[in-house]
């Protein structure tokens, strides 16, 4: 899982 994916899982798209 790359940083964008973990933020996506965690915050619902903020890291995408």
UniProtKB/Swiss-Prot annotation:
Disulfide bonds: none annotated. Its main location: secreted. GO terms for cellular component: extracellular region. One of its GO terms (biological process) is adaptive immune response. Keywords: Adaptive immunity, Blood coagulation, Coiled coil, Disulfide bond, Hemostasis, Immunity, Innate immunity, Secreted. Conversion of fibrinogen to fibrin is triggered by thrombin, which cleaves fibrinopeptides A and B from alpha and beta chains, and thus exposes the N-terminal polymerization sites responsible for the formation of the soft clot. The soft clot is converted into the hard clot by factor XIIIA which catalyzes the epsilon-(gamma-glutamyl)lysine cross-linking between gamma chains (stronger) and between alpha chains (weaker) of different monomers. Forms F13A-mediated cross-links between a glutamine and the epsilon-amino group of a lysine residue, forming fibronectin-fibrinogen heteropolymers. It is found in: Secreted. Heterohexamer; disulfide linked. Contains 2 sets of 3 non-identical chains (alpha, beta and gamma). The 2 heterotrimers are in head to head conformation with the N-termini in a small central domain. A long coiled coil structure formed by 3 polypeptide chains connects the central nodule to the C-terminal domains (distal nodules). The long C-terminal ends of the alpha chains fold back, contributing a fourth strand to the coiled coil structure. Cleaved by the protease thrombin to yield monomers which, together with fibrinogen beta (FGB) and fibrinogen gamma (FGG), polymerize to form an insoluble fibrin matrix. Fibrin has a major function in hemostasis as one of the primary components of blood clots. In addition, functions during the early stages of wound repair to stabilize the lesion and guide cell migration during re-epithelialization. Was originally thought to be essential for platelet aggregation, based on in vitro studies using anticoagulated blood. This is Fibrinogen alpha chain. It comes from Oryctolagus cuniculus (Rabbit).
């Amino acid at each position: 899982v790359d940083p964008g994916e973990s933020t996506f899982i965690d915050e619902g798209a903020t890291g995408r």
